[in-house]
């Protein structure tokens, strides 16, 4: 899970990409919600905002704009 705009968002489905990056862990590195992590990239596929239904990434990003270079916690 991660926090964004004071809301907890659960990652329900994701894919790990074994790829190099030079970003701080938690940094959004694409507009498709790919997140830098320790030694690779996490591509989020499905998530759920607190008190809302689960959404695939396309549906979620239509209503929530998480900008590239945002650092998630």
From Swiss-Prot:
Where does the signal sequence lie? none
Could you tell me what this protein is called?
Answer: Methionyl-tRNA formyltransferase
Write down the Pfam families for this protein, in alphabetical order.
Formyl_trans_C
A molecular function (GO) held by this record is: methionyl-tRNA formyltransferase activity
The answer to whether UniProt assigns keyword Membrane to this entry is no
Free-text function comment from the UniProt entry: Attaches a formyl group to the free amino group of methionyl-tRNA(fMet). The formyl group appears to play a dual role in the initiator identity of N-formylmethionyl-tRNA by promoting its recognition by IF2 and preventing the misappropriation of this tRNA by the elongation apparatus.
Gene name as annotated: fmt
Q: Which UniProt keywords apply?
A: Protein biosynthesis, Transferase
User: What family does the database annotate?
Assistant: Belongs to the Fmt family.
Q: Known catalysed reaction(s)?
A: L-methionyl-tRNA(fMet) + (6R)-10-formyltetrahydrofolate = N-formyl-L-methionyl-tRNA(fMet) + (6S)-5,6,7,8-tetrahydrofolate + H(+)
**What EC number(s) would the UniProt record show?**
2.1.2.9
Enumerate the CDD domains for this protein.
Answer: Met_tRNA_FMT_C
Which SUPFAM superfamilies does its entry note? Answer: FMT C-terminal domain-like
């Amino acid at each position: 899970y991660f926090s964004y705009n004071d809301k907890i968002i659960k990652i329900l489905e994701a894919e790990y990409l074994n790829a190099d990056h030079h970003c701080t862990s938690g940094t959004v590195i694409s507009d498709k919600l790919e997140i830098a992590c320790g030694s690779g990239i996490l591509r989020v596929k499905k998530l759920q905002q607190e008190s809302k239904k689960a959404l695939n990434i396309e549906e979620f990003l239509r209503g929530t704009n998480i900008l590239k270079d945002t650092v998630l916690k």
